[in-house]
Curated annotation (Swiss-Prot):
The keyword Iron does not apply. GO terms for biological process: translational termination. The gene is frr. Pfam families: RRF. PANTHER family: MITOCHONDRIAL RIBOSOME RECYCLING FACTOR PSEUDO 1, RIBOSOME RECYCLING FACTOR. Keywords: Cytoplasm, Protein biosynthesis. The keyword Membrane does not apply. Responsible for the release of ribosomes from messenger RNA at the termination of protein biosynthesis. May increase the efficiency of translation by recycling ribosomes from one round of translation to another. Belongs to the RRF family. This is Ribosome-recycling factor. It is found in: Cytoplasm.
Length: 182
């Protein structure tokens, strides 16, 4: 595994962690809360965002306007069955999701969930580093690179690992601040 490949994988891991953080509900409306909601549309699971316009008219409301009005009920059912934790209200034209304020206990739970996502991201980055170090050692063993080159590559790899784990830590601090803001 080359350094560029390892860095690319680490970058993707940071992005995946950011997406995971986006699914955590804070006290504010955010359309990305519905990213993982799949609607059983004509027998196939379809992402909600491809079936409806999702907007946030204010800080506590998400508005879902299906492109096909006949799909209102199945969209409402999919949201109810999802793990979003919000109750949809259907007025016949649009579906509204009101975001209730978070209790302090719920905020603590969400901080723990965010910390878990961050730890999963850090572990994934360390696994990428381990795989890259293994491939560097293999190259060194086969005399394809010198011992000095291998050491240099491992040092660069460690710097990348530190950089991307620090980025995940920054994202976690941001998310914790976001969750804790009343």
């Amino acid at each position: 595994m080359k350094l560029a490949e390892a860095e690319s994988k680490m970058q993707h891991t940071v992005e995946a962690t950011q997406r995971a953080f986006n699914t955590i509900r804070t006290g504010r409306a955010n359309a990305s809360l519905l990213d993982k909601v799949l609607v059983d549309y004509y027998g196939s699971p379809t992402p909600l965002k491809s079936l409806a316009n999702i907007s946030t008219p204010d800080a506590t409301t998400i508005l879902i306007q299906p492109y096909d009005k006949s799909s209102l009920n199945i969209v409402e059912k999919a949201i109810s069955l999802s793990d979003v934790g919000l109750t949809p209200s259907n007025d016949g034209a649009v579906i509204r999701l009101n975001i209730p304020p978070l209790t302090s206990d719920r905020r603590k739970e969400l901080v723990k969930i965010a910390a878990k996502y961050a730890e999963e991201g850090r572990v994934a980055i360390r696994n990428i580093r381990r795989d890259a170090v293994d491939s560097i050692r293999k190259l060194e063993k086969n005399a394809e690179v010198s011992e000095d080159e291998a050491k240099d590559q491992q040092d660069k790899l460690q710097k990348l690992t530190n950089k991307y784990t620090a980025r995940i830590d920054e994202l976690l601090v941001e998310k914790e601040k976001d969750i804790s803001t009343v």
